[in-house]
């Protein structure tokens, strides 16, 4: 007899961690029939008291390794050929065909929960419930007879918003990634673990057949809010699991709990003052939040409730292209045994990572638990913020290096989520290109951006938060003419803002964007603060500024119908 992905295992009697299985029928271990096509499904490692395994539909797998620690997972990954050990102790693994997320292959099941709530389009692509069920069963059948790795974890450091997660992975290194990135229950919590609220099933080796499975191609990442399952297949890129849960929280927290979910980093000062840093890739979000004078709450995903700012995660997934101990000492020290480095290249004849080598991808990454950062705040919960920083790498050299935003401008720039791509960041990019990503994380938003902006405006009012727009990009002209803003200047401006040193200095309104530009800042030359004065040709600056303002307005056309009229007061006036 064969077995299928629809087979459901019954939990073994207490003290027994295996079951005999064939087809859809199961017998406890004490009934030992002598049939060659029986196999033992064993639960090994550190299984919770209450498995709830029958809910997974994975009764046909052969071995389930539960909650293995980093050493066990590294050992298993090495033995399975899933990676190599670096000279610093980290596990180096390749994610295969996909070295980044695949947004065109991300789907959301369209059902009674999501039909009238999700912001459908090219970010949230609808998938039918019946097709999901059929695909899930095929993935389960694919895993039949194989070893899988199960982990109970959770998201959200604030206990009031804790989301229990079960991760089931085909590969050991994928499970180690989840150990590092999600929050880790204590041994006591694991022993009492109740049924998980959400499940991630990740099978990189399974390849979908688009004509049969209704996917675009062989890889997929699908969120099902009714079954509370994230189904991933055909891709080994571990970030799909992390961003899958982020997508879940971006729906559940704002929609069900009125909690603002944010794609940002966060840190806390010695007085407990919290600052948030929003920004797209390459804007300095990770670098600027890693301040030795402040404690790191988290580097990527946070919630803002009525009580606190809290990290969604228990670790960091940092870019490591061109990493040096001088530029990023905290990240450099965090790459050690238990960490993962992805898609890196070794220096010839060694196990030393060549961080400058982007031959596999520019998106090389390292994953490590947050306690590997010396000044991390654990638990990762902070007070309400007093300062928010919107970071942009403006390659056109138009935006001021720092400016103060009013409420309308803050919501407008939050929804816009502007930065710029420069030559070398992507194939085909030969000159600066505007990039807009709503709420600095459009790819992860199940709801209309206006919903998140409204919550931001509400929080700003309640807690008297000051929002700053910080340009970490170009000064003295556009990319190719001007130069990149010095990191020391940007740090000085952020420090001055945090310490209140910009509150009383003279300022002027930018003629097009209307933002308030300070005239002076400690540690920064005055001429740097006014971008027009840094250009050799002021008329050329004016023309480029008008061009950028027009790009903002055109981009915002897609959101106008879904936002409050007050938000439009923050729009540029070309």
Per-segment meaning from a language model:
Residues 285:
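Conserved lysine of the Walker
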Residues 528, 533-574:
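Generic C-terminus detector
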Residues 288:
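Hydrophobic positions on the alpha1 helix immediately C-terminal to the Walker A/P-loop
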Residues 42-87, 263-280, 291-292, 303-534, ...:
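Glycine-rich, often acidic-flanked micro-motifs
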Residues 213-252:
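Charged, amphipathic alpha-helical linker segments immediately N-terminal to NTP-binding catalytic cores
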Residues 151, 259-266:
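A short glycine-rich, hydrophobically flanked beta-strand micro-motif that places a catalytic Asp/Glu
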Residues 2-14, 18-30, 34:
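Short, low-complexity intrinsically disordered segments enriched in small and basic residues
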Residues 41-192:
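N-terminal accessory targeting/assembly segments
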């Amino acid at each position: 007899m064969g077995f299928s992905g629809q087979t459901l295992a019954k939990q073994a009697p207490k003290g027994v961690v295996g079951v005999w299985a064939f087809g859809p029928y199961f017998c406890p271990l004490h009934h030992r029939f002598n049939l060659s096509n029986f196999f033992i499904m064993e639960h090994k490692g550190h299984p919770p008291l209450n498995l709830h395994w029958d809910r997974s539909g994975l009764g046909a797998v052969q071995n389930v390794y539960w909650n293995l620690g980093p050493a066990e997972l590294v050992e298993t990954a090495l033995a399975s050929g899933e990676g190599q050990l670096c000279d610093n102790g980290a596990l180096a693994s390749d994610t295969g065909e996909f070295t980044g997320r695949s947004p065109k292959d991300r789907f959301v099941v369209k059902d009674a929960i999501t039909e009238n709530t999700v912001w459908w389009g090219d970010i949230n692509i609808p998938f039918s419930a019946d097709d999901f069920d059929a695909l899930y069963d095929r993935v389960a059948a694919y895993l039949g007879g194989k070893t899988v790795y199960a982990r109970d974890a959770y998201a959200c450091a604030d206990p009031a918003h804790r989301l229990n997660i079960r991760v089931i992975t085909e590969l050991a290194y994928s499970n180690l990634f989840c150990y590092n990135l999600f929050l880790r229950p204590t041994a006591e919590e694991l022993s009492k673990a109740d049924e998980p609220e959400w499940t991630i099933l990740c099978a990189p080796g399974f390849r979908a057949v688009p004509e049969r499975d209704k996917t675009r191609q062989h890889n997929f990442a699908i969120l099902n809010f009714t079954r509370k399952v994230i189904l991933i297949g055909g891709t080994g890129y571990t970030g799909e699991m992390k961003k899958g849960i982020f997508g879940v929280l971006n729906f559940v927290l704002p929609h069900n709990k009125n909690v603002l979910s944010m794609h940002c980093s966060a840190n806390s000062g010695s007085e407990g003052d919290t600052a948030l840093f929003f920004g797209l890739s390459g804007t300095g979000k990770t670098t600027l939040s890693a301040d030795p004078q402040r404690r790191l709450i988290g580097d990527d995903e946070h919630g803002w409730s009525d009580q606190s700012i809290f990290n969604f995660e228990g670790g960091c997934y940092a870019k490591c292209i061109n990493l040096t101990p001088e530029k990023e000492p905290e990240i450099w020290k965090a790459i050690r045994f238990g960490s993962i480095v992805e898609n890196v290249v070794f220096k010839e004849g060694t196990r030393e990572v060549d961080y400058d080598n982007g031959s596999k991808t520019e998106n090389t990454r390292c994953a490590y638990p947050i306690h590997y950062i010396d000044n991390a705040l654990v638990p990762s919960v902070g007070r309400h913020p007093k300062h928010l920083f919107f970071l942009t790498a403006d390659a056109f050299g138009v935006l001021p290096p720092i400016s103060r935003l009013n409420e309308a401008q803050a919501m407008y720039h939050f929804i816009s989520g502007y930065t710029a791509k420069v030559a070398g960041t992507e194939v085909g990019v030969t000159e600066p290109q505007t990039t807009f990503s709503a709420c600095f994380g459009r790819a992860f938003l199940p709801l209309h951006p206006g919903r998140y902006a409204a919550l931001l405006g509400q929080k700003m009012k309640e807690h008297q938060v000051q929002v700053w727009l910080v340009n970490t990009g170009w000064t003295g002209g556009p990319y190719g003419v001007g130069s990149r803003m010095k990191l020391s200047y940007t740090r000085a401006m952020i420090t001055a803002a945090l310490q209140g040193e910009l509150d009383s200095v003279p300022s002027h309104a930018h003629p097009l964007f209307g933002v308030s530009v300070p005239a002076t800042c400690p540690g920064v030359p005055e001429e740097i603060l006014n971008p027009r004065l840094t250009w050799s040709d002021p008329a050329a600056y004016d023309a480029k500024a008008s061009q950028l303002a027009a790009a903002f307005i055109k981009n915002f056309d897609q959101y106008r119908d879904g936002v409050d009229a007050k938000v439009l007061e923050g729009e540029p006036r070309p």
